[in-house]
Amino acid sequence: MLGSEYSKVSLFRVVVFMTKAHEEYMEYALGLAVKAQGRTSPNPMVGAVLVKDGYIVGEGFTNPAGGPHAEIVALTEAGKSAKGSTVYVTLEPCAHYGRTGPCADALIAAGVKEVYSAIEDPNPDVNGKGHARLRDAGIPVHTGISQSAAAEINKPFFKYVVSGQPWVTAKFAVSLDGKIATNMGESQWITGEQSRQRVHHMRNVTDAILVGAGTVLADNPNLTTRLQDNTDNIRNPLRIVVDSSGRVSPKARVYHPDTPGNSVLATTSQAKASHCKQLESQGVKIWNLPEDANGRVNLNSLLDKIGEEGMLTLLVEGGSEILGAFVADGLMDQVCA
């Protein structure tokens, strides 16, 4: 009897130990995934780890669109050691042909032993097909480890594949009198240096930033990314100026050809053709969009357009008018004050 009880305790300890090990490997894979933040659109951030005999033999995270996915990077690093390994991946392996081949097929061909997948991919092209293909090949698939964390890091992708629109985050500063002030101009900052650097870090991992015409007229910002650290990995997101009637001068910094990155004028038929033509000659793209009931750019149509361009994330940095419009239309997903 005592031996039987001892065996149960020992088995329990083994189960707890293995569960903890699975969680730790998945957490490591999640850490890899976030290294790709802001660099994978329209694909999700994914991390993958291959483990064999208690050692990590391969790891990777998703490359920019068109490049290898996390699983392929990990398989390449593992080489022959991939055979018989256990895979920990933060999102269901894809099962369709896009710019690259199906990751599920690559895992099968490599001879992996089993797969731990944090969460199913809601993309209609995948949506359980990757897991099914692995199981059909005789590879056990376990899901649910670190599921909440995996869903959290890919909220923008999950929204995108369902709605076709980007994840919208608002960033604004509030003065002591409770008023919203723009926080991207050179002369109108009301926040400290630490907060300003935070904004630049947010820009560095977002696909597009958006301001209204009023902000540009008041502050004439560059809307570029300026980091004090990690300067080798700076990215300037697409700059979108919402200007329904074309009030902002082509001489504005945001439109200047020497300003790093690309700019877009989101406007309506109210803007003069000559104004748009001048901006186009400076390399600015023109998005002529429908008007809303107030004669302004229809923001829902604008989000559709951003999604069509394959962008998953949008940072709204405008003042009270543009922020209020997004809130009124129910288009805000997240707010950072």
Model-predicted segments: where are they?
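Residue-level signal for inorganic ion chemistry
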Residues: 29, 47, 94, 134, ...
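Residues at the N-termini of beta-strands
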Residues: 114-115, 208, 313, 334
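Active-site ligand-binding patch in enzyme domains
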Residues: 159, 167-176, 180-312, 321-324
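Short beta-strand scaffold segments in enzyme catalytic cores
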Residues: 45-52, 172-173
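Short acidic amphipathic segments
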Residues: 326-334
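Zn2+-dependent cytidine deaminase-like catalytic core
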Residues: 50-149, 238, 264, 268-271, ...
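Short, basic/aromatic recognition patches
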Residues: 21-41, 160
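N-terminal amphipathic/basic-hydrophobic helices that include classical n-h-c signal peptides
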Residues: 1-17
